[in-house]
Amino acid sequence: VTMVTLGLDTSNYTTSAAVFDGADGVNAGRLLEVRPGQLGLRQSEALFQHVKALPGRMAELAESGVLRDVAAVAASARPRAVEGSYMPCFLAGESQGRALAAALGVPFFAVSHQQGHLAAAAWSAGRMELLDAPFLAWHLSGGTTELLYVQPEGANVKAGRIGGTADISAGQLIDRTGVLLGLDFPAGRALDALAAGAEKGPKRFKVKMDGLEFSLSGMENQVRALAAGGVEPAAVARFALDTVSDVVRRTTEEARKRYPGLPVLCSGGVASNSGLRQMLTASCGALFAEPRYSTDNAMGVAILAHRLLERGE
């Protein structure tokens, strides 16, 4: 009998449920509804939408015929596996996960949203073995721009932040640039498409770095100034994306001097940006999660459930 595990992830942006059988998996996800012009949701509203959306995600999995012989359930219970990391929206997935596990008489595992991202990224990059030795990982998303040092911890992973932004995240810069240019939130994909139409953006802004830390708020002011100065939207988009790619590349190169020989794995919505991928692949052979497993998903959570169950943890 194939051992199937179920993962649930109820983040700030997406309601997801996924199953994994040890090799392959299916993820059913749906973005939360954000009103046009708004930058995200309050926690109470996100939690309410998740509670309403989860049965639909489960039904999707059931209809595709993959939801049987579930041997364990896992859910993202918090953003990161560190003391004091908490967000009410994860309660939706965790409580339904615990209830399902109890009803099925199978183990329940609580993992972090970040651990799920790392597992999904490694699996979708075709490099699941990364999870069994130290590596460097960029998490580039709407809420975080972090460079992590990741090492195995039993069947799961332990991630420590070694660099990234001191203020707004790359995703926030991209979303704010997009909304400023009249695009919908979240704006990553649309901004990427818009930037592709630019002959050439204004000369990229060289973001100051302090070791492996950098700040993007000054960059946001530059974007506002360009847009207000009548620079065409495609060029502004290109400028924002090129600048982000450049500082991520420089930080990665600096990190590789400090941690020689470690592979670099990139995930998070911003990691699906085409320019960034080209730049990092060329500069350090970085590995990338598949775009659909780069954004929030429950796949990594289901993968971790499988690993934890298999190794009897």
Model-predicted segments: where are they?
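A contiguous, well-structured pocket-lining segment that forms one wall/lid of small-molecule binding clefts
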Residues: 193-264, 270-281, 285-287, 306-312
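A short helix-loop
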Residues: 10-11, 27, 129-133, 139-141, ...
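Glycine-rich phosphate-binding/hydrolytic loop that grips phosphoryl groups
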Residues: 117-121, 290-313
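Short, well-ordered amphipathic alpha-helical segments that serve as non-catalytic structural scaffolds
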Residues: 31, 49-64, 247-252
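Short glycine-rich, Thr/Ser-proximal phosphate-binding strand/loop in the N-terminal lobe
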Residues: 10-48, 156-161
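Short beta-strand-loop/turn "lid" adjacent to the catalytic site in phosphate-handling enzymes
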Residues: 59-98, 102
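Conserved phosphate-binding catalytic cores of ATP/NTP-utilizing and phosphoryl-transfer enzymes
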Residues: 106-136, 304
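Glycine-rich beta-strand-to-loop/alpha-helix junction loops that act as flexible
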Residues: 75-78, 141, 265-273
